Amino acid sequence: MSTDQLTAAASRVPPKQRRSPRVPRPSARVLLLFAIIAALITVWEATVTLTKTNEIILPKPSSIFLALVDGFSAPVTSRASYFPHIRQTMSEVLAGYVVGSAAGLGLATISVRFALVEYLLRPFVVALQSMPKIALAPLLIVWFGFGFNSKFALVILATFFPLFVNGIAGFKSVEEGPLRMMQSFGASAWQIFSKVTFPTALPYIFAGLEIGMVHAITSAVAAEFLGGQLGLGVEIIIMEQTLDVPGIFSVLMILAFIGWLMSVLLGYLRRRIVYWAPVERARADAR
């Protein structure tokens, strides 16, 4: 067989398909996650028990669980119940998160539409963001008191910046080709924004929402550290004064769960709305 015949025959042999790495199914991944968590809790419990570590230093997971049971089983009207504190903190977080995100995204839209607005606003926004939010809390308490309003205002300030910056970056990420095509068809400014600019910016906006969510929780709790009657941050300070370390850990577990739950909800919305984004397609293929 000649060299040409060998080459032709080789060209007809289908190339070996590369095997993609096997990704565990969602149910298997969930089981693996729970197994890791259970193993860590077991090691933690055994270590504290065997070393006889003082629970003021590091409480056992069983003690933290009992603190959670006590907090959730106490009458809702009592001071020991966790429910009033969760309701207070969540109202501060959600209200400030919605208003701050809407304000940041709204001003980002205006700034992209009018370059002068962005030029004038950006120095003030960056200067405000450079200030630690906890440093603004005492001033907000002087202005608005120890109640809901001061925490609400601080959460707005904390969530505004991620949406403002990410919104501008997303709106400016639109390529010239689609814009010129829409303009050539005589599309209005609103049609271009709603059909091209805003959908293109959605991955950036969701990234800003995820960052803002973390800032909302941390800023609300930090403001509650400085004063108030209700809130998970207030509860942590009271427990710190009584050396109730298992109680402090239990409140931290609640905050971690709240953050995880909000992240899951945002992730679900992102997958439903921005399913066409390359990152979401890659995640869908991995499943």
List each model region and its residues.
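Generic hydrophobic transmembrane alpha-helix motif, especially the helices
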Residues: V126-P162, A169-G170
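Transmembrane alpha-helical segments of polytopic membrane transport and secretion proteins
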Residues: M1-I37, V264-R287
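Transmembrane alpha-helices
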Residues: A153, L157, W190-A223, S250, ...
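Short cytoplasmic-facing helical segments at TM-TM junctions of multi-pass membrane proteins
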Residues: L163-L209, L232, I236
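Periplasmic/extracellular loop-to-transmembrane helix junction in inner-membrane transport proteins
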Residues: R22, L50-V98
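Transmembrane-helix boundary motif in ABC transporter permease subunits
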Residues: A95-V125
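Hydrophobic alpha-helical transmembrane segments of polytopic membrane proteins
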Residues: G233-R270
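Hydrophobic alpha-helical elements at and bordering transmembrane segments
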Residues: Y82-I86, M90, L120-A127, G167, ...
